[in-house]
Amino acid sequence: MIYWILLALAIVSEITGTLALKWASVGGGHAGFILMLVMISLSYILLSFSVKRIALGVAYALWEGVGIVLITLFSVLLFNETLTVQKALGLLVLIAGILLIKTGTRTVSRKAEVRHVAG
């Protein structure tokens, strides 16, 4: 469970960092770039811890996919960017892909993982 929490925090950090990048570019100054650097770095650190127990493909798909969806939505709300039908369809396809990856990944028990490493 803790690894899923770490992944969720990694996603929140990525979203915050990316939005800070946009904020800095439209007038947030140096504080925005510093926030971006800290949050993106934290995001990668948290992601690296989460993949200890979550399959890499699943963790990365969720981290990147959920991040893209939420960054797009927040960009529309905070920065008045447009959400066209084509973009919305792209986000739906992305969500469908994430769900397919998640449901198509089997979980490995801790015992099987230890046996595999032990040889």
From Swiss-Prot:
One of its GO terms (molecular function) is amino-acid betaine transmembrane transporter activity. Signal peptide: none annotated. It is found in: Cell inner membrane. One of its GO terms (cellular component) is plasma membrane. GO terms for biological process: glycine betaine transport; spermidine transmembrane transport. InterPro entries: Small_drug/metabolite_transptr (IPR000390), Small_multidrug_res (IPR045324). Keywords: Cell inner membrane, Cell membrane, Membrane, Transmembrane, Transmembrane helix, Transport. It is a multi-pass membrane protein. Its main location: membrane. It comes from the Bacteria. Pfam families: Multi_Drug_Res (PF00893). The keyword ATP-binding does not apply. The chain crosses the membrane at residues 1-21, 31-51, 54-74, 81-101. Gene3D superfamilies: 1.10.3730.20. Belongs to the drug/metabolite transporter (DMT) superfamily. Small multidrug resistance (SMR) (TC 2.A.7.1) family. MdtJ subfamily. Forms a complex with MdtI. Catalyzes the excretion of spermidine. PANTHER family: SMR FAMILY PROTON-DEPENDENT DRUG EFFLUX TRANSPORTER SUGE (PTHR30561), SPERMIDINE EXPORT PROTEIN MDTJ (PTHR30561:SF2). This is Spermidine export protein MdtJ. It comes from Cronobacter sakazakii (strain ATCC BAA-894).
